[in-house]
Amino acid sequence: MGKLKKKGERGAATNYVSRNQALKKLQLSLPDFRRLCILKGIYPVEPKNKKKVNKGSTANKTYYYVKDIQWLAHEPVLNKFREFKVFLRKLKKAIAKEQPGTADRLEDNKPVYTLDHIVKERYPTFIDALRDLDDALSMLFLFSIMPQTDKIQAAVVQDCRRLSVEFQHYIISSRSLRKVFFSIKGIYFQAEIQGQTITWITPYQFCQDPPTDVDFRVMLTFVDFYKTMMGFINFKLYNNLNMHYPPVLADKTDKKLDTNYCKDTEVEDEVLAALNHTLKIIQTQEEDLEVDEFPIDPNSEDAEAIQAQKEEETKLERLKNLFSECKVFLSREVPRETLVFMIRSFGGQVSWDVSTAIGATFAETDESITHQIVDRPSQGHQFLSRYYIQPQWVADSINQGKLLPVEEYFPGEELPPHLSPFVKEEEGDYVPPERKAIMDQEMDTNQNEVTEEEEVPDMTREEKELAVAAMPRKDRRLYEKIMHSKKKKRSEVRKLESKRKVHDEEKAKKKLKSS
């Protein structure tokens, strides 16, 4: 007769381990354990039956998979954490004994770990890294404008700033930007890189006051990993475009004016951060390959799909060169870096006043300027050869894929609603009048391309009632729930439409009074 197994020695209980047990096994402190889990991508799990895992107890505990903890035990970074612990103990002892020579020697030999192998381990292919790029970009752009504090070092801010500027230069060079949206939280951007849609948010350029209730140690661990990951991604992206990495300016001409605003050693970095100069491309002897075009057989099965793909490519090429014929000047009060990034990503030329920032390419007095972006109701001196518009015109033009009329965006005018390009209305949802107008225009342009389909006759009320009565009880309950949710959605839509109607009436009354 075999030995009886005790409770908790088999089944689900052996698949999980509590956090305290994991700390004892790895011989780590809680902050080091958290840092290691973040770097390796290990997250807590919720067992299906806590009683079985916790030997009948229902106390709240954090659990991990046993396999994950065993995997962490073989991580090379774990040894570096232990070496760093020994280093701190020796350094503290040398300082207490007033041995500056020993302390300096220990500082020079401080243990440092690299995360290259972890990045390659978590992202076996480049596409895997691109799919996980959204959070990395949002975090790096956030820390790129953070002030230096006792928790945030200046070197971290500089690295985040450098990596974010390099990524923006790639987007400009490859014309990969697709959508922009100004929100209360920040500015949302969406780009398409190698078939992957990447969305990130950048904060507005204001002075940031870091909150005290945020654990910056956890956030800085994420930043540490994202910096290494972003370095690999930027190198690969630049290599695909045959550009130097780190980026090098294509035209290193006279910059005497630039040295008036920064040190000589910082000029090139500041000009790169201005996003207004092209980067140097590695010259290759390979000739540009031209894609052969073959006539489309109208009788083939894929004729419609091929034609639709061609039209989509033409539309995308037109979007990439949206501002190619625009020469834009930015006033002091507008968000310069954001607008430069947006306009140059679609082929436009941008500049600003020389005293505002480094990197200006032409002056305000240039007669070839087509648009000047302002954000104040009145201007001291106006040129008749250009349009004065508000910044929202740039974002709305990008989202609609065409240069919009400028009359609604003149200084002092009440701007049209800034609609989010990320919202996709489903059947029965509330659609604002402005969105309806855009959708109607798109339907008019595509009217000739839509093929006529056979109309399916609607069921009468009696036929619907008979069909519902013939349903099984389970299907009928599901049908009633669906109809109830649709009815609730319709009532909410009616409320929003009535609110919008009242708003439009009040707006019309104000216009009449002002006139």
Curated annotation (Swiss-Prot):
Top-level taxonomic group: Eukaryota
Pfam families: BRCT_2, Pescadillo_N
Coiled coil region boundaries: 270-327
Region (Disordered): 477-515
Basic residues composition bias: residue spans: 484-501
PROSITE patterns given in the database record: BRCT (PS50172)
SMART domains xrefs: BRCT (SM00292)
GO BP terms, alphabetized: maturation of 5.8S rRNA from tricistronic rRNA transcript (SSU-rRNA, 5.8S rRNA, LSU-rRNA); maturation of LSU-rRNA from tricistronic rRNA transcript (SSU-rRNA, 5.8S rRNA, LSU-rRNA)
InterPro entries the UniProt entry points to: BRCT_dom, BRCT_dom_sf, PES
Keyword check for rRNA processing: yes
Annotated signal peptide: none
A GO molecular-function descriptor: ribonucleoprotein complex binding
GO-annotated cellular components: nucleoplasm; PeBoW complex; preribosome, large subunit precursor
The keyword Coiled coil is assigned to this record: yes
Keywords assigned: Coiled coil, Nucleus, Ribosome biogenesis, rRNA processing
Ranges for domain BRCT: 318-411
Subcellular location as annotated: Nucleus, Nucleolus; Nucleus, Nucleoplasm
Stated role: Required for maturation of ribosomal RNAs and formation of the large ribosomal subunit.
Family: Belongs to the pescadillo family.
The name this protein goes by in its record: Pescadillo homolog
